[in-house]
Amino acid sequence: MALSFSRDRSRALPLAAEIGALGVVFGDIGTSPLYALKQGVLAVGGTDFTSADVMGLLSLITWSIILSVTVKYVMLVLRADNDGEGGILALVTLLDLHRSAIGLRWYLLAAGLVGAAMLIGDGVLTPAMSVLSAIEGLQVISPALLDWIVPLTVLVLAAVFLSQRLGTERIASFYGPIMVLWFGSLAVLGVYGIMQAPEVLAGLDPRAGFHTVTTHPGLAGVIIGACFLAITGGEALYADLGHFGRKTIARAWLFVAMPALLLNYFGQGAILLRDPQAVRNPFYDLCPDLFDIPLLFLATAATVIASQSIITGVFSLAKQAIELGYLPPMRIRYTSEHNEQHIYVGRLNWLLMVACIAVVLGFEASDRLASAYGIAVAFAMVTTSILFVAQVNRAWKWPKPAVIALGIGLFSLDAAFASANLTKLHEGGWLPLTIAGIVIFVMVSWRRGLEGVVAQQQRFTEPLDEFVLRGDRASDAESPRTAIFLSRAGAMTPVALSRMADLLKVRFQRAVIVSVWIAARPRVSVDDRVRVTNLDGGFIRVDLRFGYMQQIDVPSVLGPALSARGVDPDEAIYVIGHERIIPPDEVVRGRDVVAHVFAFLARNAERSVDRFGLPRSRTVEIGYPVKL
């Protein structure tokens, strides 16, 4: 039986919703004070920095937060929701690309897939960077604890990933209050630091940032790339739009998260002005020694929450890609009876865990990991801007001058960050790009393979109407049962049905042809989910439509429609085709490589009986070869 989900974010009390948003949406960007300013100071020369350098870094961080997060995401991009959902793939589906010219369609689709792959690549680095930065506070408490940092980081990450299969619904209610305490601590510590050196507020002047960049022209890219670490969580605001809605996220950002972050950055800057040696860890040095241990535990909890949010986001992104046909089906388990966002993708979870732990063991310190961190998000932000400008132009019909001005503004900002992050390429930035490249290759291989399978099926099957007309003449016997055939061929005859008729010469008293379609929106209402067409000869065609965020349970949705037509759904059998992919014998072209990759993915993909929730005791699979 399908789970019944309710979406009640609009009914939630504003304060409760905003507290929840702090726990889910701002985990990544909220933990950036652990490392962002520190990396900026290291970029300008470690302990050999001037007060002007500190002011400049604070200026760059401040105006990056204002322009990229507040203006771009909160004021603009969050308005581009697809039935309440956000994220790069939601924006792709919102553009309704099938109505576009072929060249533009592929350009925008490629941008969306690249952005999605970049975010998945970032999902490997963000938990490692966040948790490692928090636990490095141990060396501030006692240098003797230095050797424990990496083992403890690995243990925390392993615990986070291993707990995913249990679901997070019960503990998620604590995320908001913990993050409220975290942001409150950021603000209090920031005010404490600013009071010791109020002259640090001169860093609000944007000219200070310009001065620092021009003073260190050879390090400009490195400096901007380091400051970009302060906004890497900005994309999460859009990705988590479906959890809380634009107004809730905007209020939580403008009145809680952003002020707390800015106060803390300036507090760290004040400490650096007083003591240049604080560059070893300005976040923890901002805190009085008495509170170091409580702050360490709070920071670790905050980074665990940030990691949890990233993992959940990757799961959600993968589900969207699966339902839209860009990733092979994987077993998705819903861990909540009330919230469809709470899912667990086992294979992906294990891959992420192994990759995250390998990253920690390989880099060992947040200073070295920072060289790899941020580049994937920078390019994801570029793709978001491309898709958003297309949405403004095509759907919102802004005047051309306004579209051009918006495009120039967004692309100038994103290009500065992306080009600055390219300076990290040889120091570790290749890692997230490599991960993203692998994801893109898998997406393209799966999509091309699916298209090849459908093309082969259409070559060797006939239109369903023609099959219905010749059905009686082609059969030697009739089964009194009702058979339900799942088809991905639309108006064509399912391969399983045609093979049963041609090879076994058997027809069923009633045959129900079911096609499952994924709509270009997150949810399809119950009234629009089922369309039934009665055909001749006891055939019934049923089209089921689901949103790309909905659980697909064919029996529960199909049952009422069959019962209304005198068919007992509990007595019917399901017949599904199972393709045995045969790739080329020799690999001589790029498409041959794609075919072999698709064959491997198909062998390891979730079977249709599990994906569609079919009863195993009443499901028959008919295998057939498909040569690519």
Swiss-Prot record:
Species of origin: Azorhizobium caulinodans (strain ATCC 43989 / DSM 5975 / JCM 20966 / LMG 6465 / NBRC 14845 / NCIMB 13405 / ORS 571)
Entry GO CC: plasma membrane
PANTHER family linked to this entry: LOW AFFINITY POTASSIUM TRANSPORT SYSTEM PROTEIN KUP, OSMOTIC STRESS POTASSIUM TRANSPORTER
Keyword GTP-binding: no
Molecular function in Gene Ontology: potassium ion transmembrane transporter activity; symporter activity
Topology of this chain in the membrane: Multi-pass membrane protein
Role noted for this protein: Transport of potassium into the cell. Likely operates as a K(+):H(+) symporter.
InterPro entries named in the record: K+_transporter, K_trans_C, K_trans_N, Kup
Location(s), subcellular: Cell inner membrane
Gene name in the database record: kup
Protein name: Probable potassium transport system protein Kup
Chain ranges passing through the membrane: 12-32, 57-77, 106-126, 141-161, 174-194, 219-239, 253-273, 295-315, 343-363, 369-389, 402-422, 425-445
Record-linked Pfam families: K_trans, K_trans_C
Reaction(s) this enzyme catalyzes, per UniProt: K(+)(in) + H(+)(in) = K(+)(out) + H(+)(out)
Coiled-coil annotated residue ranges, if any: none
Protein family (similarity comment): Belongs to the HAK/KUP transporter (TC 2.A.72) family.
Organism taxonomic ancestry: Bacteria, Pseudomonadati, Pseudomonadota, Alphaproteobacteria, Hyphomicrobiales
Primary residence: membrane
Keywords: Cell inner membrane, Cell membrane, Ion transport, Membrane, Potassium, Potassium transport, Symport, Transmembrane, Transmembrane helix, Transport
